[in-house]
């Protein structure tokens, strides 16, 4: 299965009548492996900050997480594995695998839990595949 198929079929899938606003699979260096049409472009320093938070959980909490210059308040995640952020009525979930970052961005009416489920399910699958 291509990386684009993972995005199209597993991240942008319908969950209880709702979809993520955008999604992508990135390399740890920020290289885009596949993305949805509306996925924002990360800046290199944003990827650096995200990767540092995986290595040093809590790094982003004081300043927030920036994605394409949009600021997200970092909320409870799983240290070293998942970063979650909130911005207004929407948010973001980032799951780290051995080689990739699985990213989902949502807006209402999708819930944080639905976003977490979609992103983390694919991330867990990729981890089991050694990716």
Curated annotation (Swiss-Prot):
UniProt motif (Involved in PIP2 interaction) ranges:
81-97
Membrane-spanning segments? none
| Cellular component aspect of the GO annotation | cell cortex; cytoskeleton
What post-translational events are described? Phosphorylated by MAP kinases.
**CDD domains, sorted:** PROF
Chief place where the protein resides: cytoplasm
List of residues that carry Phosphothreonine: 111
The entry lists its GO molecular-function terms as: actin monomer binding
**Signal peptide range:** none
- Taxonomically, which superkingdom? Eukaryota
Report the locations given in the UniProt record.
Cytoplasm, Cytoskeleton
Cysteines joined through disulfide linkages: 13-115
InterPro entries noted in UniProt: PFN (IPR048278), PFN_euk (IPR005455), PFN_sf (IPR036140), Profilin_CS (IPR027310)
Which keywords belong to this entry? Answer: Actin-binding, Allergen, Cytoplasm, Cytoskeleton, Disulfide bond, Phosphoprotein
Task: Give the note.
Answer: The variability of the residues taking part of IgE-binding epitopes might be responsible of the difference in cross-reactivity among olive pollen cultivars, and between distantly related pollen species, leading to a variable range of allergy reactions among atopic patients.
**Family membership:** Belongs to the profilin family.
State the oligomer form and interacting partners. Answer: Occurs in many kinds of cells as a complex with monomeric actin in a 1:1 ratio.
Q: Give the function comment from the record.
A: Binds to actin and affects the structure of the cytoskeleton. At high concentrations, profilin prevents the polymerization of actin, whereas it enhances it at low concentrations.
Q: What is this protein called?
A: Profilin-8
Source organism: Phleum pratense (Common timothy)
């Amino acid at each position: 299965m291509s990386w684009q198929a993972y995005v199209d079929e597993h991240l942008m899938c319908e969950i209880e009548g709702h979809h993520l606003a955008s999604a992508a699979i990135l390399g740890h260096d920020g290289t885009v492996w596949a993305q949805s049409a509306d996925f924002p472009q990360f800046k290199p320093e944003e990827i650096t900050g995200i990767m540092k938070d995986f290595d040093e959980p809590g790094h982003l909490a004081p300043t927030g997480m920036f994605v394409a210059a949009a600021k997200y308040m970092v909320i409870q995640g799983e240290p070293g594995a998942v970063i979650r952020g909130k911005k207004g009525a929407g948010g973001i979930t980032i799951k780290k695998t051995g080689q990739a970052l699985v990213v989902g961005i949502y807006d209402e009416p999708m819930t944080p839990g639905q976003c977490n489920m979609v992103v983390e399910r694919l991330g867990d699958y990729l981890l089991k595949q050694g990716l």
